[in-house]
UniProtKB/Swiss-Prot annotation, chain A:
One of its GO terms (biological process) is protein targeting to vacuole. It comes from Arabidopsis thaliana (Mouse-ear cress). Its main location: cytoplasm. Mutagenesis of His-88 to Tyr converts the repressor of flowering 'TERMINAL FLOWER 1' into a 'FLOWERING LOCUS T'-like activator of flowering. It comes from the Eukaryota. Controls inflorescence meristem identity and is required for maintenance of an indeterminate inflorescence. Prevents the expression of 'APETALA1' and 'LEAFY'. Also plays a role in the regulation of the time of flowering in the long-day flowering pathway. May form complexes with phosphorylated ligands by interfering with kinases and their effectors. This is Protein TERMINAL FLOWER 1. GO terms for molecular function: transcription coregulator activity.
From Swiss-Prot, chain B:
It is found in: Nucleus. This is bZIP transcription factor 27. A motif (Nuclear localization signal) lies at residues 152-159. GO terms for biological process: positive regulation of DNA-templated transcription; regulation of photoperiodism, flowering. It comes from the Eukaryota. The gene is FDP. GO terms for cellular component: nucleus. Disruption phenotype: Slightly delayed flowering. In the plants missing both FD and FDP, fd-2 fdp-1 strongly delayed flowering, even in the presence of high FT levels.
Length: 177, 234
């Protein structure tokens, strides 16, 4: 947390997560997202098969009296060149106490595994610090056309305190790397 | 082998020299087809490089007739002279082209003169022939539209949509390339951060290890003295 300057969100800016999904923010809480002990780092590629079950999300910040909301979205639906369905909502967990992990929170939208069909998608985890503990039942008729900014305003979450994203494309896609 | 090499040379030469004359070009390539496959391919290459797409299609129509008419070496003379006999812009119908070749055999005339003397209005002649082209080969009309004056109305629409599509694809490709670069940059940035993080952590751990070593060493010393004192009784 000491070395969390603006540098930390550089990859988020370069990857246009800041801009497409979020406004500029200063990370203040450390969040670890890992699939099967493999930590998610910005811009890394993960295979859909390796993200089929929900990740472990640890919050290294706050205390047990502070509460956090986690949102996972895909801003590149159906494809990154024309994301007319953006954002696609994958997961919402609220009331996660600080210093714990997402399993201690309330899952209000169940985890949907990433299934990118067209192009390379970004999958973004955004963490907000709640002003107080509260139970929310977000009105989500469809996972498509979700808007993280609007959601944050609606539930008075303010700016994010942490975010991380990974890339994923079809399992069978031709990879150049 | 020798003769085929010679043909090769001749055909290449003609392909270069007659690039302005469409009908003779097609004739040359069909001749090449008669003589040898390799030469044919080379001629094609030349034609394709010159992006004279529609001659190929023209050619297909003319081929059988030419095959029947000129199967021998004798036509090579005519063939070489042909470009000079033909007026470059208006490609005359196939029958007339062969007649001209036969008549003027080795008497080359400057092409512009022919055009001017035979036709009062070059533009009209051109329009006529291109319309013939259109009629005989509808697929070629987009290419011929490039020559101007003709079929603007019909050509316009499809030409526009084609250009539009190409433009859109280009834009899309650029966006995609930009995204790809951004992805790479983000990935690199992240790796740099990770390196920096690991380096500081490594440095911290090294210092910690040093401190532990020192602590251990002093503890050992203390231990030793203790051991000696405890083994002292003997």
């Amino acid at each position: 947390m000491e070395n969390m300057g603006t540098r930390v969100i550089e990859p988020l800016i370069m990857g246009r997560v800041v801009g497409d999904v979020l406004d500029f923010f200063t990370p203040t809480t450390k969040m670890n997202v890992s699939y099967n002990k493999k930590q998610v780092s910005n811009g890394h590629e993960l295979f859909p098969s390796s993200v089929s079950s929900k990740p472990r999300v640890e919050i290294h910040g706050g205390d047990l009296r502070s509460f956090f909301t986690l949102v996972m979205i895909d801003p590149d639906v159906p494809g990154p060149s024309d994301p007319f369905l953006k954002e696609h909502l994958h997961w919402i967990v609220t009331n996660i106490p600080g210093t714990t992990d997402a399993t201690f929170g309330k899952e209000v939208v169940s985890y949907e595994l990433p299934r990118p069909s067209i192009g390379i998608h970004r999958f973004v985890f955004v963490l907000f610090r709640q002003k107080q503990r509260r139970v929310i039942f977000p009105n989500i008729p469809s996972r498509d056309h979700f808007n993280t900014r609007k959601f944050a305003v609606e539930y008075d979450l303010g700016l994010p305190v942490a975010a991380v994203f990974f890339n994923a494309q079809r399992e069978t896609a031709a990879r150049k790397r | 082998m020798l003769s085929s090499a010679k043909h090769n040379k001749i055909n290449n030469h003609s392909a270069f020299s007659i690039s302005s004359s469409s009908s003779s070009l097609s004739t040359s390539s069909s001749l090449g087809h008669n003589k040898s496959q390799v030469t044919m391919e080379e001629v094609w290459k030349e034609i394709n490089l010159g992006s004279l797409h529609y001659h190929r299609q023209l050619n297909i129509g003319h081929e059988p007739m030419l095959k029947n008419q000129n199967p021998n070496n004798s036509i090579f003379q005519d063939f070489l002279n042909m470009p000079l006999n033909q007026p470059p812009p208006p490609p005359p119908p196939p029958s007339s082209s062969t007649i001209v070749t036969a008549l003027y055999g080795s008497l080359p005339l400057p092409p512009p003169a022919t055009v001017l003397s035979l036709n009062s209005g070059v533009g009209f002649e051109f329009l006529d022939t291109t319309e013939n082209l259109l009629a005989s080969n509808p697929r070629s009309f987009e290419e011929s539209a490039k020559f101007g004056c003709l079929g603007k109305k019909r050509g316009q629409d499809s030409d526009d949509t084609r250009g539009d599509r190409r433009y859109k694809r280009m834009i899309k490709n650029r966006e995609s390339a930009a995204r790809s670069r951004a992805r790479k940059q983000a990935y690199t940035n992240e790796l740099e951060l990770e390196i920096a993080h690991l380096q500081t952590e490594n440095a911290r751990l090294k210092i910690q290890q040093e401190q532990l070593k020192i602590a251990e060493a002093t503890q050992n010393q203390v231990k030793k003295t203790l051991q000696r004192s405890s083994t002292a009784p003997f």
